[in-house]
């Protein structure tokens, strides 16, 4: 599948067609066990919607935040969507401004890329209102600035998939689509509890041993090779996290049981989605992923949490204008 960074369809290349635009950006799974801050893919059954209006005053302001993720800051500089638009506004020295309304569909501190979704949706909508809309690769730079507000660091593993769709390798300089068989599906289970990204990053401060880094590098290589060659056994051999998961798993009640339930249901691999507490698992078919969901959810029920589950292809689409 050819996925490239292009100007948004529906956005004029010469003049804005309106003074208001809306965009949707889905949830995403980041890290993917072997690619900390590098790999991610969308889960398009749930997401955030952002409405942006072009205003005469050269400023960026947030008019409202609605939906399931509350409370979130209305201060522009402290909000990922607001910070991303500020970065764009300052870089382009725009003579006009933006007012945005955010409708949150992604739970707060869920490991499902909620901060990235608001950020990318805001940028896509604002981009449609520029006199000369930018390519998405240009927007990615602003999105990195916005994401840093939520986690304290610039990383693109939740952002890249929303710009390109599908599994994406994300460095700070470029986004690289990774070919994945269309039959492969992801199960994502979100327990009804919170784990703040900053707290999840705190446990990673101690240095890692070189042999563990080598093992993780080999696992990443196996997963990427397995994707490109449509070889599920290569993915099975590599889709395990020896660096991040051992430190974060103790923060997530029920994680180990949930992971084992997925693996016993013939998952190619299962681990923490983003910073957690959500858990993802890869399967070779949709039916296998759907069949595994009840057992994974039961593990969180036993730990005292309600949960939600979604199944989507690993080739799911990213963000889009509405």
UniProtKB/Swiss-Prot annotation:
Question: Pathway involvement?
Answer: Amino-acid biosynthesis; L-threonine biosynthesis; L-threonine from L-aspartate: step 4/5
Q: Where does ATP bind?
A: 107-117
Q: Which Pfam families match?
A: GHMP_kinases_C, GHMP_kinases_N
Location within or outside the cell: Cytoplasm
InterPro entries the UniProt entry points to: GHMP_kinase_C_dom, GHMP_kinase_C_sf, GHMP_kinase_N_dom, Homoserine_kinase, Ribosomal_Su5_D2-typ_SF, Ribsml_uS5_D2-typ_fold_subgr
Q: Does the keyword Magnesium apply?
A: no
- The leader peptide range reads none
Q: Name one GO biological process term.
A: threonine biosynthetic process
Report keywords, A-Z: Amino-acid biosynthesis, ATP-binding, Cytoplasm, Kinase, Nucleotide-binding, Threonine biosynthesis, Transferase
Matching entries from SUPFAM superfamilies are given as: GHMP Kinase, C-terminal domain, Ribosomal protein S5 domain 2-like
Highest taxon, organism lineage = Bacteria
GO MF entry, a single one = homoserine kinase activity
EC nos = 2.7.1.39
The record's GO CC annotations read:
cytoplasm
Classify the main location: cytoplasm
- Which reaction(s) does the protein catalyse, per the Swiss-Prot or TrEMBL entry? L-homoserine + ATP = O-phospho-L-homoserine + ADP + H(+)
Cited function: Catalyzes the ATP-dependent phosphorylation of L-homoserine to L-homoserine phosphate.
Give the family from UniProt: Belongs to the GHMP kinase family. Homoserine kinase subfamily.
Q: What is this protein called?
A: Homoserine kinase
Annotated source species: Xylella fastidiosa (strain Temecula1 / ATCC 700964)
């Amino acid at each position: 599948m050819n996925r490239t960074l292009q100007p948004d369809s529906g956005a004029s290349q010469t003049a804005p067609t309106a003074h208001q635009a809306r965009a949707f950006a889905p949830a995403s799974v980041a890290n993917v066990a072997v690619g900390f801050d590098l790999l991610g893919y969308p889960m398009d059954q749930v997401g955030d919607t952002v409405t942006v209006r072009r205003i005469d005053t050269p400023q960026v302001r947030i008019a409202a935040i609605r939906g399931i993720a509350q409370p979130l800051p209305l201060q522009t500089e402290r909000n990922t969507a607001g910070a991303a638009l500020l970065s764009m506004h300052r870089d382009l020295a725009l003579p006009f401004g933006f007012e945005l309304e955010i409708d949150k569909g992604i739970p707060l501190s869920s490991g499902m890329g909620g901060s990235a979704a608001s950020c990318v949706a805001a940028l896509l909508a604002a981009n449609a209102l520029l006199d000369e809309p930018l390519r998405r690769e240009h927007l990615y730079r602003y999105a990195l600035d916005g994401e840093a507000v939520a986690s304290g660091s610039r990383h693109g593993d939740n952002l890249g998939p929303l710009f390109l769709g599908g599994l994406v390798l994300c460095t700070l300089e470029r986004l690289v689509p990774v070919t994945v068989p269309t039959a492969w599906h992801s199960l994502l289970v979100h327990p009804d509890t919170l784990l703040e990204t900053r707290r999840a990053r705190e446990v990673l401060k101690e240095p890692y041993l070189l042999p563990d880094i080598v093992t993780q590098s080999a696992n990443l290589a196996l997963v990427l090779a397995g994707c490109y060659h449509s070889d599920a056994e290569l993915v099975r051999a590599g889709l395990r996290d020896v660096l991040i998961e051992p430190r974060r798993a103790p923060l997530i009640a029920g994680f180990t049981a949930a992971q084992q339930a997925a693996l016993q249901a013939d998952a190619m691999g299962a681990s923490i989605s983003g910073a957690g507490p959500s858990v993802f698992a890869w399967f070779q078919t949709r039916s296998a992923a759907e069949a595994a969901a009840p057992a994974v959810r039961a593990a969180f029920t036993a730990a005292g949490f309600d949960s939600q589950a979604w199944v989507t292809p690993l080739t799911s689409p990213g963000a889009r204008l509405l």
